[in-house]
């Protein structure tokens, strides 16, 4: 869920800044083919537009900037602020295991510690002769204090001695690590504000070390609260099956992008007050980074669906019908009454794919009644109501069979039988649709058709 993208977009647009998309792809093991295109499509679908991106500018993919990173790696090596490390992954793992067994906090111990210059030269020659490709590590000032005034959380401070020792800025394959590359990119592209999740807080002191080593001024940082599952109270996980966390899921199910943007925009930020439905323009106007929440934001799928339903109810029929069309077509239900069916169920929908289940009544066998529905149909006045309505519907011509004419027939049954309220409407609804609740009854009867409505009532009477 691209919460940080959304809020960074609002920040940039509110302040009249430049919003850009940069592809951070230095971790080749996690590289996903076609992932970039998919991410950009999802942002476009949400209505997030940008000023600069790999589509319009060169070198906006980190994998295309290796020569730029190499320049600064070489600079730090030449200045003695970084060094080549020949420790193997196996040696690092063994040392980490030893430290954990001894109850120590795992950290990298400088491999050259205690070596003379001659010993160091011999060590490097031996390692290179063995074909070991080095990494490059930043020499950490362990006595240094790295602090910043976080936009969201206020002042945060780290001691240089508590970040795990000298850390890798360039991997064996020549690619930079994330914490090194983003500093180079942010500085050269003139990024003024970095807004991201608070899982990046531990990365910030490392990035400040790089800014310090290169003599550059750091941007402002803001770390947004983590997102928790509203049902479990725990950090949102990909394994949480009760939530839709990926934009692809919302697109696939036929949610309105405006609703998803609205929901995301309120995760970790709110403008104050009780209002929860905002247009994109209102979001941009109202956005205030000082109102970014310090407390965890709850991802509530029910609230997302409520919000989506509000958008669908207020959207024009053509928009929702076009959203629902693919689902109706796939289910073989794109009939001449399809648009009327969408209009009928539009007030109940949270996503367009729900139209298939909602319209089962019109295309499937009559559903099995629940215990509660059977209890309603056991009422002593039910046969009277159903027989009276059946007679009214049988007397109607096909030309007269319209929603505006069906409701007066139901009212006539009320007048003739003296039965009203739920004792009148509930048995009719259950007999016709097999459900206790649903859209307007005259519209349901009309779309079901006169013959099928009479057949359902007749079958119900026989079962009583």
Swiss-Prot record:
Gene3D superfamilies: 1.10.10.350, HUPs. It is found in: Cytoplasm. SUPFAM superfamilies: An anticodon-binding domain of class I aminoacyl-tRNA synthetases (SSF48163), Nucleotidylyl transferase (SSF52374). One of its GO terms (cellular component) is cytosol. GO terms for molecular function: ATP binding; glutamate-tRNA ligase activity; tRNA binding; zinc ion binding. GO terms for biological process: glutamyl-tRNA aminoacylation. A motif ('KMSKS' region) lies at residues 235-239. Keywords: Aminoacyl-tRNA synthetase, ATP-binding, Cytoplasm, Ligase, Nucleotide-binding, Protein biosynthesis. InterPro entries: aa-tRNA-synth_I_cd-bd (IPR045462), aa-tRNA-synth_I_codon-bd_sub2 (IPR020751), aa_tRNA-synth_I_cd-bd_sf (IPR008925), Glu-tRNA-ligase_bac/mito (IPR004527), Glu/Gln-tRNA-synth (IPR000924), Glu/Gln-tRNA-synth_Ib_cat-dom (IPR020058), GluQ/Sye (IPR049940), GluRS_core (IPR033910). CDD domains: GluRS_core. The keyword Ribonucleoprotein does not apply. It is an enzyme of class 6 (ligase). Its EC number is 6.1.1.17. ATP binds at residue 238. Pfam families: Anticodon_2, tRNA-synt_1c. NCBIfam families: gltX_bact. Catalyzes the attachment of glutamate to tRNA(Glu) in a two-step reaction: glutamate is first activated by ATP to form Glu-AMP and then transferred to the acceptor end of tRNA(Glu). Belongs to the class-I aminoacyl-tRNA synthetase family. Glutamate--tRNA ligase type 1 subfamily. This is Glutamate--tRNA ligase. It comes from Streptococcus suis (strain 05ZYH33).
């Amino acid at each position: 869920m691209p919460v940080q993208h959304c809020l960074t977009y609002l920040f940039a647009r509110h302040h009249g800044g430049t919003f850009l998309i940069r592809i951070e792809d230095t971790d080749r093991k996690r590289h996903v083919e076609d992932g970039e295109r998919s991410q950009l499509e999802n942002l476009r679908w949400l209505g997030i537009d940008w000023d600069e991106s790999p589509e319009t500018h060169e070198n906006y993919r980190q994998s295309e900037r290796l020569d730029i990173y190499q320049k600064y790696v070489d600079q730090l090596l030449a200045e003695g602020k970084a060094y080549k490390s020949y420790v193997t992954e196996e040696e690092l793992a063994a040392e980490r295991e030893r430290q954990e067994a001894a109850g120590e906090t795992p950290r990298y111990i400088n491999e050259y510690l205690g070596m003379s210059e001659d010993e160091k030269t011999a060590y490097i020659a031996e390692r290179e002769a063995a074909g070991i490709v080095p990494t490059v590590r930043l020499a950490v000032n362990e006595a240094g204090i790295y602090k910043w005034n976080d936009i969201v959380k206020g002042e945060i401070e780290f001691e240089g001695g508590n970040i795990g020792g000298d850390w890798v800025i360039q991997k064996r394959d020549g690619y930079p690590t994330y914490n090194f590359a983003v500093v180079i990119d942010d500085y050269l592209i003139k990024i003024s504000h970095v807004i991201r999740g608070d899982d990046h807080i531990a990365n910030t002191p490392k990035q400040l070390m790089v800014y310090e080593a290169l003599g550059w001024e750091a941007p402002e940082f803001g770390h947004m609260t983590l997102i928790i599952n509203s049902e479990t109270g725990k950090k949102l996980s990909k394994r949480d099956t009760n939530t839709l966390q990926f934009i692809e899921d919302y697109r696939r199910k036929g949610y309105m992008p405006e609703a998803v943007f609205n929901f995301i925009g309120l995760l970790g930020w709110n403008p104050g007050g009780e209002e929860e439905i905002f247009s994109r323009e209102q979001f941009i106007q109202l956005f205030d980074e000082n109102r970014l929440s310090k407390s965890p934001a709850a991802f509530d799928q029910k609230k997302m669906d409520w919000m989506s339903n509000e958008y669908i109810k207020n959207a024009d029929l053509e928009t929702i019908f076009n959203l629902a069309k693919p689902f109706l077509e796939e289910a073989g239900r794109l009939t001449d009454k399809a648009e009327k069916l969408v209009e009928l169920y539009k007030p109940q929908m949270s996503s367009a794919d729900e139209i298939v289940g909602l319209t089962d009544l019109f295309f499937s066998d009559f559903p099995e009644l629940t215990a509660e529905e059977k209890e309603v149909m056991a009422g002593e006045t039910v046969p009277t109501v159903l027989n009276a309505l059946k007679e009214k519907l049988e007397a109607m011509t096909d030309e007269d069979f319209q929603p505006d004419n069906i409701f007066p027939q139901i009212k006539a049954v009320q007048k003739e039988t003296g039965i009203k309220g739920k004792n009148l409407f509930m048995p009719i609804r259950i007999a016709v649709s097999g459900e206790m609740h649903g859209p307007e009854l005259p519209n349901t009867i009309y779309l079901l058709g006169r013959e099928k409505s009479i057949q359902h009532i007749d079958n119900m009477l026989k079962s009583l």
